[in-house]
Amino acid sequence: RDQPRSRGLGDVYKRQGYLRVPVVGAGTANTEFETISGMSLRYFGAGEYPYKSVLSEETCESAPYVLKNLGYATHAIHNNEANFYSRRSVFSRLGFDTFTSEEYMPDISDVTATGWVKDHILTKEIIKTLDATDEPDYIYTISVQGHGDYPTEPVLDDPEITVTGAEDREKNNYSWEYYVNQIHEMDIFVKELTTKLADYPEPVVLVMYGDHLPTMGLKVEDLE
C-alpha cells in the first residue's frame, strides 16, 4: 500500500549532491576510509581493505586528526559490533577519541527481522555524545539497519510498504519489500535526528551519505 514519506531525507535532500564510492553491494569500510582519510582506494591493491591491512598497525592522516588540532573532540558511533571490520582498533588509529559501538548502548533490543539493531537508537547516542564535551565535536556515525542480506521469503508481518512486479521474480519482490521498509524506518529516524539537532543549543552541520548500493543482483547498466 502507498505510504507517504516522513520527509526526513527530503529535508536533507534540499542540499544534495552526488558521491562516487569505491564499492557496490558491500565494503562499507572502504567508503568509510575514503571519506575519513581523503585517500582513494586506487592507491591500494585490488580488493584490499586498509582497515585490515595498513591500519592494523599504522596510523593515518585523517579528518579527525586535523580537527583535533583545531580543538575538536572526535567520536565514532556504530550500532553494530565493534570488531566488525576491526573498527575497535582502527578508529583510534584514524584519530577518534571515542568509539561507541552496540556493546556500549543501553538497549539494543529493537532489531530488524534479520537481526540488525535499528537506527533510531543512534539519535540518543549522538545527542549524548554532543552533551558530554565542552569543545566542538566531530561525530562520525555509521548506521546498520539497511544492511543485507535481504530475505527472499516474507519476513515482515504487516509491512508499511508492499512490493510487486520485480521482473516476475517473487523472491526478489520480498527482498525489495524488506529493503524499502527498512529505508522507510530509517527515513523516520532521519526526521527525528534532524528535529533534535535543529533545537540543539550549538551550531550543527549534518552531512549524510550512502556507503554503497544494496546487493540486489544489480547489473552495470543499473548503475549508470
Predicted regions and their residues:
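Solvent-exposed soluble domains appended to multi-pass membrane proteins
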Residues: 1, 6-224
